[in-house]
């Protein structure tokens, strides 16, 4: 009996020891798991807050270095959290700013694509108070993308997003000018004139005056167009813009059937630059309207010799 009792006691103690060993190991495992999650929470919350804070801080520097820092930091956040809204917005902002200053056209296009993708993704779940600025930056990005590509494929998107920003109360000095140029490329003359006129109240420039004159010419309001061209002649020192203004004035005179003054404008340009394709083309139009097709075609041949793909001359010589 004593032997059996002693054996049972031995096994009982052994089971108790095994129990406590297992319990201790389970406790250690539980503590390790808890520690892991606590560290992860700390890293995700505290360190992520530091990263987001640095986005605002570096963006407010308004420098190339600041934009580069925002770009890299937002990229790091998005690697772990692809739909982090603040990171998406700032990645879009910084990509655009870097694209604007990039001298390599291909790199600039890649950055613009990043900007547009990030901003469009950010729009899906952003705060209502942030949405107007995202729309504004999207409008700017599409405008610059169209400018780089030398086409107007994106003008409708520029108008769409900038108007969304304006309708929500967003204000920026460059919006009227961007809208004016985009409406012009879409052939919406009335809205272009309205936007350019608003831009003129913000800051007058010779280029803006020329663009307004061009739109009034397209709208067949020639007397108003000439008034703006006079202001260009009075204020501009940009030789290229002045030549474009004389070309436009020559076109206005042709529309008014004032062929002598139109000829004078084109000859004025050719006295300074005999290789002006547009001036030779304009002279050809004057000769054609006077009934002298031989002289007209001679001028258009000169035009094509200078600029082989001049659309107007190609059409006339076809």
Give residue ranges: language-model regions.
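Structural marker of alpha-solenoid helical repeat scaffolds
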Residues: 80, 125-129, 168, 201-202, ...
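Register position in tetratricopeptide repeats
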Residues: 97, 144, 151, 185, ...
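Canonical tetratricopeptide repeat
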Residues: 90, 137, 178, 211-212, ...
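Residue-level recognition of tetratricopeptide repeat
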Residues: 59, 93, 97-100, 140, ...
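Helix-start (N-cap) detector for alpha-helical repeat units in TPR-like alpha-solenoids
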Residues: 51, 85-86, 129-132, 173-174, ...
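N-terminal leader/linker segments that initiate helical-solenoid repeat arrays
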Residues: 2-124, 128-129, 133
């Amino acid at each position: 009996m004593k032997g059996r009792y002693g054996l049972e006691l031995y096994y009982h103690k052994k089971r108790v020891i095994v129990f406590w060993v297992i319990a201790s190991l389970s406790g250690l495992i539980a503590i390790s798991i808890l520690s892991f999650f606590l560290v992860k929470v700390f890293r995700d919350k505290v360190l992520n807050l530091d990263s987001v804070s640095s986005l605002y801080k570096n963006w407010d520097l308004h420098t190339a270095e600041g934009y580069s820092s925002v770009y890299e930091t937002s990229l790091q956040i998005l690697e772990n959290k692809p739909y982090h809204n603040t990171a998406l917005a700032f990645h879009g902002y910084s990509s655009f700013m870097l694209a604007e200053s990039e001298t390599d056209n291909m790199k600039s296009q890649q950055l613009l694509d990043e900007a547009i993708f990030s901003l469009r993704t950010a729009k899906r779940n952003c705060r209502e108070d942030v949405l107007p600025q995202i729309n504004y930056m999207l409008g700017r990005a599409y405008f610059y993308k169209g400018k780089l590509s030398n086409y107007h494929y994106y003008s409708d998107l520029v108008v769409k997003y900038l108007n969304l920003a304006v309708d929500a109360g967003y204000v920026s000095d460059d919006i009227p000018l961007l809208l004016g140029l985009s409406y012009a490329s879409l052939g919406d003359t009335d809205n272009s004139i309205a936007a350019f006129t608003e831009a003129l109240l913000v800051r007058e420039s010779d280029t803006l005056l020329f663009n307004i004159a061009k739109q009034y010419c397209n709208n067949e309001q020639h007397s108003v167009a000439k008034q703006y061209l006079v202001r260009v002649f009075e204020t501009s020192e940009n030789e290229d813009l002045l030549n474009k203004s004389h070309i436009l004035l020559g076109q206005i005179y042709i529309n008014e059937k004032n062929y002598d003054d139109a000829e004078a404008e084109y000859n004025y340009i050719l006295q300074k630059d005999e290789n002006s394709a547009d001036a030779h083309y304009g002279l050809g139009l004057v000769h054609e309207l006077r009934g002298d097709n031989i002289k007209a075609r001679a001028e258009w041949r000169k035009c094509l010799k200078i600029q082989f793909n001049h659309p107007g001359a190609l059409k006339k010589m076809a």
